[in-house]
Amino acid sequence: MGFMRKFILCFLIFFSIISIYKLIYPNPRNWYDHYRFLAQSFLQGRLDTPNLPTFYQDSLEYQGKKYLPFPPIPALVLAPIIAIRKNVTQQQVSIIIGAINAVLVFLLLKKFTIPTSALLLTVFFALGTVAFWSSVVGTTWYFAHNTALIFFLLSLIAFKNKKDFLSGLFLTFASLCRLPIFLGIVFYIFELRKQKGRLNKFIIGALLCVPIMFIYNWLRFGGIFHTGYIEVYKSYLGTAYSIFHNFGYLDIRNIPLHFFTFLFMPPLIKNGLITPSPYGMGILFITPLLLIALIPPFNKGLEKNLFRGSLAIALVDFLHYAQGWVQFGYRFLLDFLPFLLIILAIRFKPKKIYILLLVISVAANFWGVNWAIKLGW
């Protein structure tokens, strides 16, 4: 595929996806935009968020100041945009990032399969997975996932191009959006363990920016490992929302809840009406094509290492005390979705059964996104 043809195709992917995202949710509510307030604080040379609305969850008070527990990269991405265009919303940036992610998925997957399959799987990613709702809604938790995906996908593209230092650097940037992603380093280590030169370059890149989080924590709370997440966790204990038990912040007893939500959580059926469950929905119902990437056995080498990387990230996510709160789908899937997409690309064939599963996935996500908008999620 020539450069100009690739450029035109990438532009068409970007334009098509961002148009769909904008059309399906033209008037978003634009609340829970924590990162926008944090970005404004960064531009003012401060780390606290004094102007954060009082009803916004996931914040904490420390020494008379209000802070957010989240890693800083999503706010750093927003900061220059807000500096140029003061009134830009987090959701407006989110749909742009979502469309960029679709382009990056295409560029990544065509390294593992034919262009036609890569294009079909790009449509699947953008419109048939939780990436659809995540990009469209753009609230704080989803914005972190969307931003992390940019860097995670860039890391995998750089890895495939043998740019190992950049690959490690991008993985750390992704981790400074969503901390569990750093466990994806398992994949890279297994892939490069017999190539010491490449592995060393990757490790140097991966570790170079890790101190950013430690310094950020120390400047806010006086300890390099103090993120504020534990305080937020304690604020949720005993809340009336969840029908599930309140176990520990990272607790092995949380694994069944996450596993069920990820795979099997069904929709709600009441008075003959089928609606998405606010607790999430399993990929069995809304993203069935992805099941192909989860069927063992995994071929020795790349497939097995991709699954190992997915498992390492998923394990930390599955230990978390909450399954993702109010959501369509299972948002934590986005932390390890790039690995599963590559496995899917390796196995995917443009046959009727695969196309049918793709169409079902896209239709289910259009249904779910429309309901989520209607329900005010």
Where are these regions (language model features)?
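Membrane-proximal envelope and lipid/glycan-remodeling enzymes
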Residues: 1-377
